[in-house]
């Protein structure tokens, strides 16, 4: 199954208010999806378990934790088997390694919304940063490419790669 990913590499702003969640939910809404699950990683804690998505105090506490290393959001169909391969949209924000990536199942992304999605993702980034848009097979795990862990992918196709600089007034 082919995916389209938008990956931003650079310093990520940390939000602890509703603006963070509103922005993430808006990206999902542009694809007519809702967040199903989320997962967090906090330094020195074993928090690798996925949780059913719900706005509220628990999620807010994770977001406001100074030790938050990364947070991932997933939308999956009702009949999913494995979140890692059955997601329709995954957004991963990695504060520890300074990148965020949104990976869309190619069948659900509305191509007219890509610019709006890029703008929403931009709100999380400190300028300047690098932005890449690429396609690849979901089974090759696009997150591994975004993390820079692996580079020998058979199906990757870079659509764009650019430096996003300060807006000068």
Task: Give, region by region, the residue ranges found by the protein language model.
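C-terminal interaction module
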Residues: 1-41, 139-169
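Surface-exposed beta-loop interaction hotspot
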Residues: 104-146
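N-terminal low-complexity, intrinsically disordered segments
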Residues: 21-88
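Residue-identity detector for threonine
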Residues: 3, 7, 23, 47, ...
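Aromatic/basic-lined ligand-recognition segments
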Residues: 60, 65-99, 131-169
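Alpha-helix boundary/N-cap detector
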Residues: 11, 15-19, 54, 108, ...
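Short linear motifs in intrinsically disordered/low-complexity regions
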Residues: 18, 33, 47, 66, ...
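Glycine-rich, often proline-containing surface loops adjacent to acidic residues and nearby aromatics
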Residues: 1-7, 88-108
